[in-house]
Amino acid sequence: MTESTPLSQLPWQVTRDEFLRSAAEVTSGGACCVFVIDDAIPKMARSGYAALVIAYARADEPVCILDDGAAALLVRDGGTASGRAVANRVLEQMRKLALDQTIRAGVASLGSDPSASMRAARDAATAGPAGEISVAS
């Protein structure tokens, strides 16, 4: 990856529009997980975090990398309980690499407006402590 390649164009990911379309197809029980990278991590290093989230996601869990390097992951069923389980799986892998204190996870139920759900999950992640999972209320 060159320095000029935007974070939002990593391979093996879905675009924001594809993510939102897929989320809109979930009729009930879905969740959105957002992983926010600490501001202390240089922008150039954030693609590595995004690639790890993609690597730890399952085939049926689309991942969208946002412009600032945050990663949104779609959980199709099981609601916030499944969302927490997915976020925990990713954070456990990050912990093995000693990266868990530089990333935060937020989970929100998938409602009728997937974009709002993504924002709620991101807000929960931003407000939560490093290495932890926060659930939007």
Where do the PLM segments sit?
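Amphipathic HAMP/coiled-coil signal-transducing linker helices
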Residues: 1-16
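Conserved helix-loop-beta segment at the catalytic/binding core of cyclic-nucleotide signaling proteins
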Residues: 24-27, 49-80, 92, 96-98
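Regulatory sensory/coupling modules that transmit signals to nucleotide-handling catalytic cores
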Residues: 1, 88-98, 102, 136-137
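Active-site-proximal structural segments of metal-dependent nucleotidyl cyclase/transferase enzymes
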Residues: 15-39
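CheY-like receiver
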Residues: 17, 21, 25, 85-92, ...
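Short, conserved charged micro-motifs
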Residues: 41-48, 80-85, 116
